[in-house]
Amino acid sequence: MDRRVFISSIAGGLLTVPVAAGAQQAGRPPRIGWLSAGSQPDPFLEGFREGLRRLGYVEGQTIAFEIRHAQGSLEALLAGAAELAQSNVVLIVASLTAVRAARALKDIPILFTISGDPVEAGLVRSLSRPGGNLTGITFLSLEVAGKRVEFLKQALPRLRTLAALSNTDHPGEKSELRATETAAQALGINLIYVAFSQSPFGASPELGKALERIRRAQPDAMVVFPEGATMANRLDLANFGIAQRLPSIFGWSEYADAGGLMSYGASQRDTHARLAIYADKILKGAKPGDLPIEQPTKFELVINLKTAKALGLTIPPSLLQRADQVIE
C-alpha cells in the first residue's frame, strides 16, 4: 500500500467517528486505551504495565485498560481506534502506525513510541514543545548509529565494506544514514547503501530485492536500521545473515533474540516502562503538548554467540565484556 494512501485511509476512516472520551464514570478507575498494529503476547504492553506498577497503580483498582491489537490489519486498526474513541478512555498509548490511526481524535491525549523522528513524521511541532495532544518517546539516536559501526569493526577488525539496509519510508532515515556514513568513513569502511520501501501494512517485494542486492554486493558485514518493517522481518533478516555468512548488527535486542549477531540500542520494554511516567503526569492533569519528547540515554549491547558460532566468528573478549547480554 502506498504511504499516502495509507495515511489518507486512516484519516478518512476516523473523520466520521464522534469522540465520546473524557467523561469518566464516577467510581470507576481511569481507563487507558492501548492501540497496537501488532499482536499478543505484547512485551511492550507488559513493560508499560510494569512502569505503572512501579508508580503505585493497581490494575482494576486505580487504573484500567482497553486493549486493541490489530494483528497487522489496517481495517482492525481503524476499528480499534474508533472503539477506543467510544470507550471513555482518558488516554491512548500507541506506536507510530497506530498513532496515525488515532491522531484524528484531537480531544484524547495520545502517548506514543516511535523509532524515528516524530517531527519529520508530522506528529509534533518540536521535540521540546510537541504541542497538540501528542507526546512520547523516540528511539532515534544518531550517536547509537555510529556505535553500531564501531562494534562491528571490533568484531571484524578486517571490515572494509558494510551494507546498510534502510527503509526509506521511515522518518529520520536520512539522518541515521548520515551518522552511519560518518562513522564508517572515520574507520576506513566503504558503506553500501541499500534501500527499500515498506508500507505499514501488506507484503512488499522490495525487501527481498534489497537483500538480493546485498547478496550480489558481497559486503563484509551488514547494519540494519531499526524500525517497524525490519522488526517485523527480523527472523528472515537473521536467517539471511547466517545463510550468507554475513555478520550483522541491529537496533534492538529483539533482533538478536531472533538470531541476529548483535544489537545495540535502547530496550523497548524499558522504554515503554518509562512511558508510564508520562501517563502518570497526564492522568494528574499535565497537557501532552507541554511534555517534551524524551530520547533514551541508556543503551544495551546484545551478542548472540550461537549466531557467531554459525558464522565461524570468534568475538573478542573485550567486546564480550562490554556486552549487557550474551545469548549462548
Role assignments for model-derived ranges:
Residues 1-328:
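Short hydrophobic alpha-helices and adjacent helix-cap/hinge residues
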